Structures are given as C-alpha cells and as structure tokens.
C-alpha cells in the first residue's frame, strides 16, 4: 500500500461518506446509523443528513416512511435510526439507573396497557395513569408518564411504532435474548460506528467507545478491552502524528477517491464533519 497522506484520508472520508444519492433504505443501510435530533430549525438532523444521500429527499420523508422501513429508533453512540439487527445486539439493556420496585410495577401496568391498545400516544398513557409530574434535566416540568415511557423504550420494553407531528407513538417490543458472545457483539457495534465515521483518529475512536457505552451500559466494564481489540484488529496508519483507523478492506490511498467537483452544505451532525478533531485536521 502506498504511503498514506492527510489528503488521502480526507478524500477517502468524503468519497465513502458523501456517496451518490440512492434510495432511502439503501442510504440508511450504507450509513448504518442515522443520528436524530428534534430541533426543527433549519431542519431535523436526520433530514439534513439524508437530503444529500437520498434521491429527491424531502424534509419529513424518514418520519413518513418509517413504519414501512425495517428500522428502529434507539440509542447507539447517540439517538437515531438503525436496523433491528443492530438494536438486538444492545438488548436486553441494563441501565446504570436501577428502577425501584414501584417503578417496575408502573412500567408493567403501562406495558399491559400498551399491549391491549397495540399503539399508544404519550397522551393516552397520561390520561389512563396518574403518575404526576417530574422536573426534566432542563429544569422544566414534564409528565412523569412521558419519562416512564422514555425509560421503558431505553430498556427495550417498548419500540417506536411511528411518529405523529414529531411525537413518538409506542408499541410493545418483543424481548430480546442476550447475545451469546458479548465481546463479539460489542466488536460488531464498534465496527458499525467505525464504518460510519472512518477514517478517524485514535482519540475519536476512544471517544466513540465512551459514547457507545451509553448504548450498552451493561458492557461498560468491557470498554477498555474492546478498545484495545479495535486498535489491534482495525487497519491503521500513522499520519501527521496521529494514528488513523478505518474498516477492514478499505484503502484510503486508492486512486478511486478523487476530490468532488461539487459544494455541499453540511449540518454539524453530518458524519463528514461530526468529529471536531478530524474536521480541524482535514480543513483547519
């Protein structure tokens, strides 16, 4: 393999991540994970990401087509959209915050209610159960039932069936058996994340593993060993004083990765520019 330069890495990053527009399912599959954000101005993160990668994409298309797509909403390194197979690797999730027996009784009652209805709006749960109100992390008051639904979704008891004007509607989620090999499952999740953000500096690889632990808190004790394995098994090269990593089978120095003769306005959540360390190395 020829010596790899920063120009090689930059061209490779743009070519592999900002690929020619395709269909919505194919774009999601190629990205592996699409980060979501509720802020609508100038548009949601998922729409700003997909508009460059899906033919004739319009704001809201992902939300509109979500029920018919083989995707789920869940937390990986951040919240977003991913395949059911990837979601299954992370469950049953064991959050660091342990619920009390009373909280579990509330969850079981709500789960029974959801199963009977098939699909529920948070408003339906609030009207059926008197859970009171809680203070959010932003200091505002919110229905306790909304926080409970969020917690049930995070724990894998519920799934997002669809959205209505941006609000998540929930359905019961079948229980997922734990992976037979947690280390292999963790490695597979690392590979997915690396495939989205590669080529990436070693410091970013470590940061992504820390974010990934929020998606699989039950494996937080495996983080150090998983990072060590990733550094050992992923292709890498030292460039301008940093160790860079990318997926197996890729060649950043390939002549296929020529500069694009086009201008793209990218949002901060876009995988091309998401990592500040890489962005500063590539573009100053």
Give the positions of each predicted feature.
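Long, low-complexity intrinsically disordered regions
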Residues: 1-263, 270
């Amino acid at each position: 393999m020829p010596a790899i330069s920063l120009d090689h890495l930059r061209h490779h990053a743009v070519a592999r991540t900002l690929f020619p527009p395709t269909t919505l399912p194919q774009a999601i599959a190629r990205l592996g994970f699409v980060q979501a954000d509720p802020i609508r101005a100038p548009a949601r993160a998922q729409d700003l990401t997909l508009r460059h990668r899906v033919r004739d994409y319009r704001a809201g298309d992902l939300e509109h087509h979500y029920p018919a797509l083989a995707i789920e909403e869940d937390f990986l390194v951040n919240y977003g959209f991913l395949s059911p197979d990837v979601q299954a690797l992370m469950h049953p999730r064991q959050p660091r915050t342990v619920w009390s027996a009373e909280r579990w009784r509330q969850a079981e009652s709500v789960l029974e209610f959801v199963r009977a209805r098939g699909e529920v709006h948070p408003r339906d749960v609030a009207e059926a159960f008197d859970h009171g109100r809680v203070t959010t992390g932003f200091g505002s008051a919110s229905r306790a039932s909304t926080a409970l639904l969020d917690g049930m979704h995070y724990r894998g008891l519920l799934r997002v069936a669809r959205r209505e004007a941006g609000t998540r509607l929930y359905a019961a989620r079948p229980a997922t058996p734990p992976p037979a090999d947690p280390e292999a499952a963790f490695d597979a999740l690392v590979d997915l994340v690396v495939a989205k953000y590669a080529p990436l500096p070693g410091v970013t690889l470590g940061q992504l593993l820390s974010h990934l632990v929020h998606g699989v808190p039950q494996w937080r004790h495996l983080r150090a060993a998983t990072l060590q394995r990733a550094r050992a098994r992923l292709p890498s090269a030292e460039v301008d004083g940093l160790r860079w990593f990318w997926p197996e089978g890729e060649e950043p120095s390939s002549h296929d990765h020529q500069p694009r003769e086009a201008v793209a306005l990218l949002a901060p959540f876009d995988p091309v520019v998401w990592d500040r360390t890489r962005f500063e190395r590539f573009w100053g």
